[in-house]
A protein has these predicted regions:
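Extended alpha-helical targeting/anchoring segments
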Residues: 1-349
């Protein structure tokens, strides 16, 4: 196994990827790389003290089922743990009013504002991963062990998938809570489907991602193949679009050019990044970066690093957010962020 760990050595990453062609690479890019990639400065404190770029290269691996993970790692006795948001609703409302000012001035049309939750546990990271997977059994969950940290990612959002020179992105925008009562669950889905606000939000981000794809694809190859689809997660409904194209550059170059994802920044992207830097209380670290794999053939599959826990010793960090537009309300957006954290809170209860 080979390892690449650095703060911002993008040339070193490209060399590592080339040298390990034919192996399976698994790793992540921290959101904080956006400062270098987009020429921004930050005065925000780091929140996780992780490498900004971290990859492992494997010669051998095997596939296992989620049931194998649960059987091997679910605890026979409960552990002690807790999770709570750092931001209160009144504090969120104050920041929300500042965002609305930027929206009314036309500086941005949509922004993804996020806030952290912190916790602690005496459970091992593998046990915690299994507990969350039991209540949130999504495909493509990812567990990664670093030198002094573990990552537990349950992201539902595909950022970039590149196979045989074909590229696809599936930005998520639009969220509704789910319930165990079938009739009410369908009613919540219908409300999401009919919401002008949620439709507009997805359209904005779809246009942004389509423009981003045009920068890395052959002219005329970018297509919106699905304008609005539904994704059913255990705790929430999401809507997403699907955009495809034919790659005109290397997979890694495309990943870096489009980084970070438009669905977790806003539009226009550069100004949204600047306002995020102004209003959020700490650097995002891995959160809303990209996490995934490069297969032995050079195909790439990365997800947006949302619904992702960082564990360092007994300390846990999680971040949640939502897209805010001119007709959003602070109360609804704050509730949406906590709804997204529900699987983690439920697993840690």
């Amino acid at each position: 196994m080979a390892k690449f760990s650095t703060q911002n050595n993008l040339r070193g990453l490209a060399k590592f990827v080339r040298q390990n062609r034919g192996r399976l690479l698994i790793g992540y890019l921290s959101y904080d790389l956006a400062y270098e990639l987009h020429g921004l400065r930050t005065s925000l404190p780091a929140n996780q003290q992780l490498p900004q770029i971290y990859f492992l290269a494997f010669d051998t691996w095997r596939q296992i089922t989620q049931q194998e993970i649960l059987t091997a790692n679910l605890p026979t006795t409960p552990g002690t743990q807790n999770f709570k948001p750092k931001l209160t609703l009144p504090q969120y409302q104050k920041i929300f009013r500042q965002i609305q000012t930027y929206l009314r001035m036309g500086e941005i049309y949509q922004i993804n504002f996020t806030h952290p939750l912190t916790g602690a546990t005496d459970l091992s990271a593998r046990t915690l991963f299994a507990k969350i997977l039991a209540v949130n059994p999504i495909p493509n969950a990812l567990y990664l062990e670093g030198e002094n940290f573990e990552i537990l990612s349950f992201s539902p959002e595909s950022f970039l998938k590149i196979q045989n020179n074909q590229i696809e992105t599936r930005p998520i925008k639009g969220t509704a809570a789910r319930t165990a009562i079938p009739a009410k669950d369908l009613s919540l889905k219908k409300s999401l489907q009919e919401s002008p606000k949620e439709k507009a939000e997805l359209n904005m981000i779809t246009d942004l991602l389509r423009n981003d794809l045009n920068q890395v694809c052959r002219p005329g190859s970018v297509q919106l193949t699905a304008a609005r689809l539904f994704q059913k997660c255990p705790q929430v409904w999401h809507t997403y679009s699907r955009i495809t194209g034919t790659l005109a550059t290397s997979p890694l170059a495309a990943l870096l050019k489009m980084f970070p994802g438009g669905s977790v920044t806003g539009c226009p992207k550069k100004r949204a990044l600047e306002i995020i830097e102004e209003l959020e209380s700490q650097r995002r670290g891995l959160y809303t970066g990209a996490i995934g794999q490069i297969d032995p053939q050079g195909n790439l599959d990365f997800r947006i690093a949302i619904r992702t826990i960082i564990k360092k010793q007994t300390r846990l960090s999680l971040q949640v957010g939502s897209g805010i537009v001119i007709d959003s309300t602070a109360e609804a957006e704050f509730a949406e962020t906590l709804q997204k954290a529900k699987p983690f809170l439920q697993a840690l209860a």
